Amino acid sequence: MKNEPKITPELVAAHGLKPDEYERILKLIGREPTFTELGIFSAMWNEHCSYKSSRIHLRGLPTKAPWVIQGPGENAGVIDIGDGQAVVFKMESHNHPSYIEPYQGATTGVGGILRDVFTMGARPIACLNALSFGAPEHAKTRHLVSGVVAGVGGYGNSFGVPTVGGQVRFHTRYDGNILVNAMAVGLADADKIFYAAASGVNMPIVYLGSKTGRDGIHGASMASAEFDDKSEEKRPTVQVGDPFAEKLLLEACLEIMEKGCVIAIQDMGAAGLTCSAVEMGAKGDLGVDLDLDAVPTRETGMSAYEMMLSESQERMLMVLKPEKEKEAEAIFKKWGLDFAVVGYTTPSKRFVVKHGGDVMADLPIKELGDEAPLYDRPHVPSAALPVVHAREVMAPMGVGSALEKLIGTPDMCSKRWVWEQYDHVILGNTMQRPGGDAAVVRVQDGPKGLALTVDVTPRYCEADPFEGGKQAVAEAWRNITAVGGKPLAITDNLNFGNPERPEIMGQFVGCLKGISEACRTLDFPVVSGNVSLYNETNGRAILPTPSIGGVGLLDDFTKSASLAFKAEGEAILLIGETHGWLGQSVYLRDICGREEGAPPPVDLAAEKRNGDCVRGMIHAGTATAVHDLSDGGLLIALAEMAMASGIGAKLLAAPTSLVSQAYWFGEDQARYLVTVPETEAGRVLAKMRGCEVPCVRIGTTGGDAIAIAGEAPVTIDKLRTSFERWLPEYMGGKAA
């Protein structure tokens, strides 16, 4: 058939299919597949598209709530925020491409997640990201940071959506496999959400957007395999993005949606035309006939195999109402985009692909997705690590010196160098910029605001996957709460190593159980997400990194809280219990040189109780500044509040019942720092006692330094110098 290669065991293996999976294909279709069919099965049955190793565990996630309009299974999740408005959001990874070609990998990661959001009928209003890089001293790290940050900024800035928050971390376990997790958030009318399921027989299937090229072929398969020393050879499988074409595609899609032309819509992401066409047909219980001669291409002589597996960017597939076809075509031509009828829906439940008059593929459409192998892989739980007792930890330096050093380390230092390359205020609705607990974005034409955050602590997840999974969700919940938002829902991006290794699968299962428990207890459902496995190189896996993207609602964005101290002479209150937990803390790692111990346990009932009280204080107007406590503990949080305002703090000494370093740098969970006017302090403390919420006064705002009783003060200027210095110097070429 058109000189297609002969199917051999080597060719099957090169497509990422195991021998038993190929036998399953033979049984399913009753014959040997064509080369194009082999490519289609490879695309639909790989880990990236089929979730074959994770699906049985994902079923345990809580996904429903009265405000959830659409949970997992569509292009993005959708939640109701009242007044006929909905928030559409999702996070997904572009890890493997970004390691091979950092600029293009990052740009197309942003482009892909934006398409997922506007495919649902939403106008994107914000992006966030979570970036994990190797050790600063690794030979490729500086190059990868530079390329990824430029790519994220280049696409978002050109497309015209603000990048409002995220995370950046460094760890040697990401040396050979960085993580680029991108999140997009959009607004839509709650009664005008668009879905992927086709309906009606003989409806036109229309190709929209940019032309198809050879870029990105096998991109989804690459994302389903671990790296080795030849990973650089996969550079041709990295897609190339064009943010200006995507902006045109956005406007054209929203316009034809508004005109009532669309029956179903699916963006061409992983596995391109194959996955989008199969999903539209299978979800609608229909067949699909495609004629590849009609596909707009930008390269000559493309084969059916290449066209079906290309991951060229900025493309959509739609099922249109036949009577609206001409109107839709005129809209796309107006925006300068390709519009081509490439097929029709059929009652056959077959996926038929024709090219040059030949049938290149004829497969059962439901089985391509629904009959993908499903694995319950062996998994072993991670061994419990011993608790690190604070009294057994030698303090190598004083508290002030430790603060000054810690706040200038790669993970704790300012990421201004990163976020200043992103346009975080375009559209004019960013009310709280990067650097705080959560971004706050105004919902246009009203008082409402959205609180947005991305969180995970991978070292906790490695040490105890269950507690680490809980903590990732709790941290997102706290960050939203700290700005005054009511947490509504999350999207997750689950990044792990090779699931065929029982210890890695054990990490995945443990983290997922923790995420599920936290989401259930906090009433914080999962509405969308992405699983990225095989994140390892030469057998060395990344730290388990289940990134959590959280969305919350503020009824009035003008009443949000921020972390900056507001005035001198205000009372500083610590809410939540402090035990001085040093296991897996950044203090223990970066000051004491010990990356060890059990992570802090997460008491979800305390998280809910403490957080609800803090949110109540914000809404009542009592709290003047709020900051949640996480990496680095109490003193790092205090320093961040002081640097944000230029106002210092006069602090009481650590309680004698606790080791000083553990009190100041321990990472106990469910805690917040809150400032209140001096006149309110007594009343607030009494109210907290009545609510059984642990709350103590630890000091007073004022001066130009962090001054702890009995310790040498550290000036804000000194802290700010340390905080701001490392990343610009590192990226400027100074040694790590």
Curated annotation (Swiss-Prot):
Gene Ontology molecular function: ATP binding; magnesium ion binding; phosphoribosylformylglycinamidine synthase activity
Magnesium is among the record's keywords: yes
EC number: 6.3.5.3
Pfam families: AIRS, AIRS_C, FGAR-AT_linker
Record: residues binding ATP: 51, 90, 492, 529
Pathway note: Purine metabolism; IMP biosynthesis via de novo pathway; 5-amino-1-(5-phospho-D-ribosyl)imidazole from N(2)-formyl-N(1)-(5-phospho-D-ribosyl)glycinamide: step 1/2
Cellular component per GO, a single term: cytoplasm
Keyword Cell cycle applies: no
Active site residues according to the UniProt entry: 48, 94 (proton acceptor)
UniProt binding sites for Mg(2+) 2: 116, 267
Subunit structure: Monomer. Part of the FGAM synthase complex composed of 1 PurL, 1 PurQ and 2 PurS subunits.
HAMAP family in the record: PurL_2
Protein name: Phosphoribosylformylglycinamidine synthase subunit PurL
Organism of this sequence: Bradyrhizobium diazoefficiens (strain JCM 10833 / BCRC 13528 / IAM 13628 / NBRC 14792 / USDA 110)
Annotated gene: purL
